């Protein structure tokens, strides 16, 4: 009887340890997938790959500029941004993020990061600020449904690539 209790106790302890170990691994895996989705979106802008950009966003996703006299700009459809990106010739804008901070709760995530934007063929930073990406996890993985961004032209520091 004592050996049965010991075995049961060991099995329960192993099961609990497995669950506890799996949770951080899953969270870390989700965090990597979130950063990867945002990176793919920005890579799509730089390479003008509209298919790559579309693969990272949900239908109806929006961009909301934050700042200016009213504090909040008019939202614009990310589909429109993708279309304009695809119509350009040559490389697209080079938007880079640094030290992303990811927060996850169930199927909702945010990624907050400092960004710089450099125009094609230029080395000078055109503008910088903070991007906040909101993502949802669905059957097809993590997808962007909204981007909020501040933007300024002064006080920008370079991101080491």
What are these regions, as identified by a protein language model?
Residues 28, 62, 76-123:
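Surface-exposed, charged secondary-structure patches
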Residues 60-63, 69, 117-119, 150-154:
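Solvent-exposed loop/turn segments at secondary-structure junctions
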Residues 128-158:
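Short beta-strand edge/turn micro-motifs at domain boundaries
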């Amino acid at each position: 009887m004592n050996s049965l209790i010991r075995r049961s106790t060991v099995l329960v302890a192993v099961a609990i340890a497995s669950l506890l170990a799996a949770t951080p691994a899953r969270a870390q895996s989700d965090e990597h997938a979130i950063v990867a989705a945002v990176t793919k979106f920005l890579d799509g802008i730089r390479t003008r790959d509209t298919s790559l950009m579309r693969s990272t966003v949900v239908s109806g996703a929006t961009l909301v500029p934050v700042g200016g006299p009213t504090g909040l700009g008019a939202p614009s459809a990310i589909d429109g941004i993708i279309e304009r990106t695809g119509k350009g010739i040559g490389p697209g804008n080079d938007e880079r993020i640094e030290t992303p901070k990811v927060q996850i709760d169930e199927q909702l995530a945010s990624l907050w990061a400092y960004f710089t934007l450099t125009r094609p063929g230029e080395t000078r930073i055109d503008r910088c600020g903070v991007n906040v990406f909101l993502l949802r996890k669905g059957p097809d993985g993590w997808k962007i449904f909204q981007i909020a961004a501040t933007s300024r032209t002064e006080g920008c520091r370079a991101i080491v690539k």
